[in-house]
Amino acid sequence: MEIRKRKGKQVGRLTVTDKQHQEDLQRLRLLRPIDDDFMRCLFKDNIPLAEFVLRIITDKPDLIITECETQKDMKRLAGARSICLDAYGTDSVGKKYDLEVQRQDKGADPHRARYHSSVMDIENLHSGQEFKELPDTYTIFIIEKDFYGQGEAVYPIERINLATGKSFEDGEHILYVNGEYRGDSAMGKLMYDFNCTKADDMNFELMANRTRYLKENPKGVSEMCKIMEDMRSESLKEVALRMLSAGKYALEEIANISGLSLDEVKKLKAERSA
């Protein structure tokens, strides 16, 4: 914080950084598990919580999760569109789970679910392997609203043989979870928790404890603020890179519009040209 003297007294004046920090703290207070930025932090290095949530959603009480990554970058084919998974887990028998939260229906388009599922296939079949070695995959979209409007807690999407009416059994599973669902069941309580801003209002201890850490513990708050600062920085860089790609802006203009320093813009240009 900058301090200026005025008639013998010190008067505090917030810098831009201080103002942003205060805005971040306010934003943090309003974040819920159904917000993807917060959800990724909830699940980061937290296999017990991921396992607990997946057990409820998949209705597999004996599910054992052995690995869980957040913001898993998936791009195995050159030129293909990359995606970053909110939470990517593996269970004790090798099945894969992609857990996503979507605030808006457009983010849950069925084609997106199809692509997420296909990307997991590409990620998990290596050269020389047989197709039958593909692991079962679960693409799970938790959507803030009831995407299909039928009041169900979960909408399982499975391929079937239309001629026989039997399951295709290709190991691909897509689940749309209704974020509006409420009730006394574990799923109803879980969706309630996903929409809570306060840990004290939550039903489940694992969810509440992690939320309390990220929102109330100084170390957790610092972690969240650092993540929000990094995201803001990445957003500024994206603006600058688009302007550099346009090729019609002076570096000083890019710095002024993007909010980056001139040195940062020069560095981006050098990296882009390398």
Language-model features, listed with the residues they occupy:
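Short, charged alpha-helical interaction segments and adjacent helix-coil junctions
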Residues: 2-29, 97-102, 188-274
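Short hydrophobic beta-strand segments that form the core of ligand-binding sensory/regulatory domains
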Residues: 176
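Accessory alpha/beta interaction modules
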Residues: 1-173, 183-185
